[in-house]
Amino acid sequence: MKRDKKEQIVQDVAEKIDRSQGIYLTEFQGLSVAKMAELRNEFRKAGVEYRVVKNTLIKKALRDLSSADRLASGLKSTTAVAFGYDDPLAPAKIIRKFSKTNEALKFKMASIDGVVYDADSLPALSEMLSKTENIGRAAGLINGVVSSVPMVVNAVARNLVSVLDQIAKQKQ
């Protein structure tokens, strides 16, 4: 590969890293072409880009990242990078699900918002709720509280009327 082409790839990968909320390194050695296409399709559906890049080019693209040294330690063997643009946890869910049926796919490590996670972190990352899911749950909780306030106020007023009615009956 010519130097110009390599520089273009490094620049392209560096730009993708800057845009990504989550960067995942995987090993895919032994994965068939059909399985790799299936995996890429799953990533595409989730808005995740999956790209095979030479380790030396990834190291150069990671230069400006604060977690570059820790991520560079995972650059051994064949490496493909998953870029999570909108949901930083989407790649973890796909990698975990796919690797259950395809042992050739191995999770190496990830960087989410500058925090590096090793291979043992995949189960925890894949089970975390996304930002959207957390916002939805919080909105549901708030809605539940807001809708129960009028019922509580009505119950207090109803009980007060009942007590006053009983007091009035006792005085008669």
Curated annotation (Swiss-Prot):
One of the Pfam families matching this protein, by short name: Ribosomal_L10
Disulfide bonds: none
GO biological process, any: translation
Keywords: Ribonucleoprotein, Ribosomal protein, RNA-binding, rRNA-binding
PROSITE patterns listed in its UniProt record: RIBOSOMAL_L10
Signal peptide: none
Coiled coil: none
Any one GO CC term of the record: large ribosomal subunit
GO MF annotation, one: structural constituent of ribosome
Listed CDD domains: Ribosomal_L10 (cd05797)
Origin: domain of life: Bacteria
Family the entry assigns: Belongs to the universal ribosomal protein uL10 family.
Purpose of the protein: Forms part of the ribosomal stalk, playing a central role in the interaction of the ribosome with GTP-bound translation factors.
The protein's assembly and partners: Part of the ribosomal stalk of the 50S ribosomal subunit. The N-terminus interacts with L11 and the large rRNA to form the base of the stalk. The C-terminus forms an elongated spine to which L12 dimers bind in a sequential fashion forming a multimeric L10(L12)X complex.
Name used for this protein in its record: Large ribosomal subunit protein uL10
Lineage: Bacteria, Pseudomonadati, Chlorobiota, Chlorobiia, Chlorobiales
Gene that specifies this protein: rplJ
